[in-house]
Amino acid sequence: MRVAITGANGFVGRNLIALLLADIPAGEIRALVRTPRQAAAELPTADLDIRVADVTRPESLRGVFDGCDAVVHTVAIPTERHGSFAAVNVGGTRNVVAEAERAGVRRIVHLSAIGASATSPYPFLRSKGEGEDAVTAARIPSVVFRPSVLFGPGDDFFPRLGFALHFPIVPVPGDGSARFQPLHVGDLALAIRAALRRDDVLGIHEIGGPDPVTYRELLAETMAGYRKRRPTMNLPVPLMKPAAFLFERVMADPPVTVAQLDLLAVDNTPHPNAMDQVFGIRPRAFRDGGLSYLSAG
């Protein structure tokens, strides 16, 4: 099987490639990247079939899926800049689907998010929903994964959460009761591999780790991962938005945005969890040391 992976040098892409290399020769894995020099240092091996492409530029995708059996689309951005949700999460996905159809690809595996819907009131989830619609409307059999928050060495979410530890008192959006079901990136990679192999898992699947945890528990585990302790304080989300707005204006890569604050106060758990029920994968635990890699970094 020849597999193309968009965002190959990203968090999910790197971990997926490392897993697939046990089954597929490196030359059969087509790694799509935007910056080849940077990707060379991030990818597991230089023996991959590396192609330079930008999902927002259809002409750069021309021919990159030729000869591929499947495409795994991992590219997305959680932070919007100047209409980037529409350009990347929506337009980029449509471009990938169009080129995959032209190339005769036989399967698309798409990485989405819990709560994705074209009618969502939240801009990020709305963009992911519109991207999903492009995938499911395609003439290619597809598997769509909607994971809860991901963790593992190199993740982006928990270091951003850890930014709050710079403050003497850590603010908690709302009452901190919003629930999440963190999923290890290695377990997501296992599910993607199964989706590439099996014909009985087509469709949309919500996935997460074994146990739901509250936002307060996420913070506690993040503190344990960094070996730090801080008192916390509940704050209404509207009171936290001015600080997030300031971060967006003065930082190139803000730890949190106004739009993301809203999502931190909303449940993010799978209903049902397809990891065990559909894919037969028992995801690894998050609690009690799941974030120990944070202090190593």
What is the meaning of each model-derived region?
Residues 195-257, 270-297:
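Mid/C-terminal beta-alpha module of Rossmann-like enzyme folds, strongest
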Residues 114-126, 150-155:
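Conserved catalytic-site region of short-chain dehydrogenase/reductase
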Residues 156-157, 174-196, 203:
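Substrate-positioning beta->alpha
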Residues 112, 133-156, 163:
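Conserved beta-loop-beta element that borders a ligand/cofactor-binding pocket
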Residues 37, 46-95, 99-102, 114-117:
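NAD(P)H-binding glycine-rich loop region in Rossmannoid oxidoreductase-like domains
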Residues 11-14, 90, 129:
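Residues forming the Rossmann-fold NAD(P)(H) cofactor-binding site
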